[in-house]
């Protein structure tokens, strides 16, 4: 029996295959075209229902328009201490409630104006915290006296355009993950016990990895991915404290650059494995 006759017999036995293949051919271009015909507001509303990682991240790879909409500030969570109408979705009075409600990959915009009280806020998922002012000084996080830190970071996180102030403690306590500090101001209040305070403290190291691997069996190739602890500081003012950064794990200070201005010092450096 010839091949084309065999295919005909197969199609007679399974006619649903023909229908399914035709539907796929019709649906794919049609569905994509229909989505592209939506206006920006409607498409952005649809994207807001997607989880930031990995769904919204994947949609940002489709085209320039989808990338613009998937990363638009309207999809960010917002912290506004002056807001009166809390019925608005994604708006919070304080940073702690915003961090608690955030999904992995979310960006939290902290509205400029006034001081936000923070104390030992743990961040256990990948987040980005951004100050809403023109300069970092317009958005200030103040750590209560007696607290260990303003923010305790246990996952990959980025802080941008923020001022963080602390007294008798540290501004940022880095436990694990990749921390990026971009264009911020870290200040430790000057006092007689200045040696007890430090803007950045990192305790990340091999102990964290060993604790994980002792409970979970993983391949050697995965170990390198788990070992992903680091701190990257970019164009950041650091003031007060015994020293800019204190490392109590296996990370060490590397690639330090300092730019002197009339009033401030701006730092670039990495805290990473040797």
Swiss-Prot record:
Matches recorded under InterPro entries: F-box-like_dom_sf, F-box_dom, Pectin_lyase_fold/virulence, SHCBP1-like
Classification via SMART domains: FBOX (SM00256)
Domain of life of the native organism: Eukaryota
Pathway it works in: Protein modification; protein ubiquitination
Keyword terms: Ubl conjugation pathway
Spans through the membrane: none
Domain (F-box): residue spans on this chain: 32-79
BP terms from Gene Ontology: protein ubiquitination
The keyword Methyltransferase belongs to this UniProt entry's keyword annotation: no
Subunit structure and binding partners: Part of a SCF (SKP1-cullin-F-box) protein ligase complex. Interacts with SKP1A/ASK1.
Protein name: F-box protein SKIP5
Lineage, broadest ranks: Eukaryota, Viridiplantae, Streptophyta, Embryophyta, Tracheophyta
Gene name of the record: SKIP5
């Amino acid at each position: 029996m010839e091949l084309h006759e065999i295919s005909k017999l197969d199609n007679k036995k399974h006619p649903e295959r023909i229908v399914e293949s035709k539907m796929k051919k019709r649906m794919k271009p049609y569905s994509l075209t229909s989505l592209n015909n939506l206006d920006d507001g409607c498409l952005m509303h649809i994207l807001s229902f997607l989880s930031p990682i990995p769904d919204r991240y994947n949609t940002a790879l489709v085209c320039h328009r989808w990338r613009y909409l998937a990363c638009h500030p309207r999809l960010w969570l917002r912290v506004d201490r002056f807001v009166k109408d809390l019925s608005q979705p994604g708006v919070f009075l304080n940073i702690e409630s915003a961090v608690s409600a955030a999904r992995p990959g979310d960006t939290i915009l902290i509205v400029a104006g006034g001081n936000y009280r923070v104390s030992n806020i743990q961040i256990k998922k990948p987040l980005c915290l951004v100050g809403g002012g023109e300069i970092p000084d317009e958005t200030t996080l103040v750590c209560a006296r007696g607290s260990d830190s303003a923010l305790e970071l246990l996952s990959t996180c980025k802080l941008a355009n923020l001022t963080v102030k602390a007294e008798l403690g540290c501004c940022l306590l880095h436990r694990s993950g990749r921390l990026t500090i971009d264009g911020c101001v870290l200040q430790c209040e000057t006092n007689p016990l200045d040696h007890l305070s430090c803007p950045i403290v990192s305790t990340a190291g091999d102990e964290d990895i060993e604790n994980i691997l002792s409970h979970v069996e993983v391949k050697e190739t995965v170990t390198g991915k788990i070992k992903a602890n680091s701190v990257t500081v970019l164009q950041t003012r650091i003031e007060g404290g015994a020293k800019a950064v204190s490392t109590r794990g296996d990370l060490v200070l590397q690639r330090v650059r300092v730019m002197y201005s009339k009033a401030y010092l701006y730092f670039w450096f990495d805290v990473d494995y040797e």
